[in-house]
Amino acid sequence: QEAIEVGIEPDIAEEIITVLIRSSLTKQEKDRVEAEGKGNGRSVLVIGGAGRMGRWFVDFFNSQGFETFVADKNIQNDTHSYSDWREAGIDFDVIIVATPIEVSAGILSELSEKKPSGLIFDIGSLKTPLRDGLNALKDSDCMITSLHPMFGPETELLSGRHLIFVDVGNKEATDKAKELFESTMVKKLDMNIDDHDRLIAYVLGLSHALNIVFFTALSGSGEAAPKLAKLSSTTFDAQLLVSEAVASDSPELYFEIQKLNEYGIEPLDALCTSATMLREIVMNDDQKSFIELMEKGKKYLDSRS
């Protein structure tokens, strides 16, 4: 009401207030992370630290007062940088593996032979492809755990974000990893390897696949494709926004998420089955089944609120 009285659209006023609140919370969180820094001069090696999520962790640990080292094939050797992680050695308080999933699997296995004494964790989107390397580190009595940040490298405020901790048999390591994020407002979730990948098959695998199918159908629509680019509707624009984000991300990472998950085919089958069911309902002019489908979906989505 106050916005209307001063000539500002309520939606715009709400958006401005939301931005201001998030900006304030972001500053508070950053100040707290710096003030309660867990680093105290301790050292951390981020393998894959020149990548997008790798850089996020480099910045995060720098802000906590860690002496941060980066190993990445795309950088040159320097006092705190290595093009080959093996050249960095293993004498670090924390070692983070932030490389593509298949690369991470090999690095974890190699680390198990070197037996670092510090905390070790990966940040992979999938865990089943890393099972052997994680178990090898556990069997070598290393301080190993596994994390999955459910947020992207552009994230500044961790409030409302989720960080999954996958204990692989060393609770002390998992607890130490959690301590690193105590000064943030991130929501910590605990899962085992198999439950994690079953859920991720739907949370990431299905949502990615749905958007890939969506923009593939649009781009393959023939003569309609250029005309579609000029049309707009609330639902279409919302879906398009998500699909554009998916299409702009790493196709290599998205393929890994689809291909390497032991549980990845199930949601793809469910997507195909659902699309076929919808097609048959429409082809058969079955309004009753269509309404039931919509109501069933609404009931499920309402239950998530």
Model regions and ranges:
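Hydrophobic/small residue at the entry helix of a nucleotide-binding pocket
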Residues: R52-M53
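Conserved N-terminal Rossmann-fold NAD(P)-binding element of oxidoreductases
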Residues: V44-G48
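Interdomain hinge/lid region at the active-site interface
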Residues: K227-D302
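Rossmann-fold NAD(P) dinucleotide-binding segment
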Residues: W85-L137
